[in-house]
Amino acid sequence: MDRQRSPRLSLDLLRGFRAAARHLSFTRAARELFVTQSAISQEVKTLEEQLGRPLFRRVNRTLQLTQTGEELYRA
């Protein structure tokens, strides 16, 4: 039986996403986790690619959660 596997999400990717979602800022998430802003941005991008859906709307240098982002944050 051939099963389609869901992407394996790493805890690091989820930690970065949750911090960014909590602060609605990659910069503040990076400060909280003691990493660079670009590291958080890349983690979120990787997570979005794995899920095949955007998690944030990037509007005028601000972040807003998409519906998928809201659902993942609450999970």
Language model: regions and residue ranges:
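The N-cap/first-turn positions of alpha helices
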Residues: S10-L13, Q37, G69
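A detector for short, charged/polar N-terminal pre-domain segments
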Residues: M1-L9, R15
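A short LG(V/I)-centered, amphipathic sequence patch enriched
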Residues: F26, E48-L65
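Conserved amphipathic alpha-helical core elements
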Residues: F17, L47-E48
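Alpha-helical residues within the helix-turn-helix
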Residues: R31, Q42, E49, E70
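Base-recognition residues in the alpha-helical recognition helix of bacterial helix-turn-helix
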Residues: R15, S41-Q42, R57
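Residues within the DNA-recognition helix of helix-turn-helix
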Residues: T36, E43-T46
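Short helix-boundary/capping micro-motifs
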Residues: A19-F34
